[in-house]
Amino acid sequence: MTESAPSAFFTTSTPADHVHEEESSNTGYFENLPENDIHSFFEIDATSEWIKQGNHQRIALQFPDSLLPYSEKVTKLIESRFRSESAKKTFVLADTSYRSCCVDEVAAAHADCTALVHFGEACHSAPTDKIDVKYVLGSMPIFIDQFRMEFQNVADQLTAEHIVLLMDSCFSHEQEKVAAVIKEVLPGNRHVECSLLPSEDVLKQNRQNIYLGREIPSCLRNNQPTDLIFCGFPNSPLLPIWLLSYPSCSTVSHFNPINKTIQHESTRSSRLLRKRLFLVEKLKDADTVGLVVGSVGVDKHREAVKRMREMCKKAGKKIYVISVGKINVPKLSNFSTDIDVFVLLSCPFGVVLDSSDYFRPVVSYFEAEIALNPAKTWAADFGWSAEFAAFLEDKIETEVPDDKAAGDFSLISGKVRVQKTEEEKNGDGPSSVAIYNPGYCNDRTWKGLNDGVSTAEDSTKMGEGRSGIAQGYSGK
């Protein structure tokens, strides 16, 4: 067991906050896989059979950065199973449009693929029905002996009656062995539950009691005090999202398969949830909302955009829909003078848990639902969710007080938020269109990203550019 300052797995940042560092700390763990392990890790036989059964002719193979070095070998192994079928073609997808945990159906569509094999960690968001998808999560050893040795050092600190075991996808095949060790080591008769990964067929047919692609243990559904045992990478997006969603997990013991140590600490979910409630108040105070589309491969994202437009309209707020691919601070800073609060529409692993580096607050779809839909209430406790599809069918109510000047009290500014009248809403409201001319940014002191070449004398007038081809433009 190791002791440290607030451990990395309690960070308020997810890979969405550091897109360039998304898998850097995990990459070395997957290096130098033996030849036999490549076949089993990438499920070559099962994948080939899936392609055969579906009679797919154009197949996209999507790899995260950590597994990209194996893409050529995996592609050749799969193609070798179909040498007699010249019509079958495979395409390697990397550097995905949004996040590597999501199905990149946009890139697959560019290659006119009818099937996609997703390798590596996945958020398990329900994909759209435009393409057939197979998930290959990989299988890595969890080092049972080292886990037993480390867990014996922290077992006495687990005091809750209920114990939940949660694992990153690539270790989930070891779940039963790890659960057996936990039951063996824990003193007394404790109730140990595993958050299992259901089969793909189950996920397609019924997602009830499923969260982040995993079955929700009964103790968490009933909000009972629970100790969490997590086996996964230090920068796993799964753990911080899970702890916010289930604050009844009072402590967490994190087994790191890289250095084979366990860290045990109390969670800070309640404090972090109160920060999310602060963001709800910021959105209530906002006049202009920017809906940032952070994924188009998740089912019902179009319905989510439509619902957000409707909620903003009823709340009397302007809304702009923005798509910038992978989000970062410089990209959103370009819109910070026009937008008061950004709402990020993304998969669960893409939720920004710490927006302190951004010029404007970045909230999740759940917080937007609480802020803009009077039918919803939330007190920074149980019920926070990173999955926007969970409440798309809920009713949107409109608060219309008898006195149109009446409003509610802002907990941030200390002022009363006045309910806008129908005339005010219809005058220059959410449905209005802002027209930007080429000189739109001229009067601003800050104009966004600067390449270091532009000058104050740069003209916004259109002129004739160069002609020709790259080999020799005119005027060279």
Curated annotation (Swiss-Prot):
UniProt key word Iron-sulfur: yes
Region (Disordered): 1-24, 451-476
Residues holding [4Fe-4S] cluster: 102, 123, 347
Residue stretches of biased makeup (Polar residues): 1-15
GO cellular component terms given for this protein: 2-(3-amino-3-carboxypropyl)histidine synthase complex
Record note on cofactor: Binds 1 [4Fe-4S] cluster per subunit. The cluster facilitates the reduction of the catalytic iron-sulfur cluster in the dph-1 subunit.
Co-factor(s): [4Fe-4S] cluster
A GO term, aspect molecular function: 2-(3-amino-3-carboxypropyl)histidine synthase activity
Subunit composition and interactions: Component of the 2-(3-amino-3-carboxypropyl)histidine synthase complex composed of dph-1, dph-2, dph-3 and a NADH-dependent reductase.
Free-text function comment from the UniProt entry: Required for the first step of diphthamide biosynthesis, a post-translational modification of histidine which occurs in elongation factor 2. Dph-1 and dph-2 transfer a 3-amino-3-carboxypropyl (ACP) group from S-adenosyl-L-methionine (SAM) to a histidine residue, the reaction is assisted by a reduction system comprising dph-3 and a NADH-dependent reductase. Facilitates the reduction of the catalytic iron-sulfur cluster found in the dph-1 subunit.
Name used for this protein in its record: 2-(3-amino-3-carboxypropyl)histidine synthase subunit 2
Organism: Caenorhabditis elegans
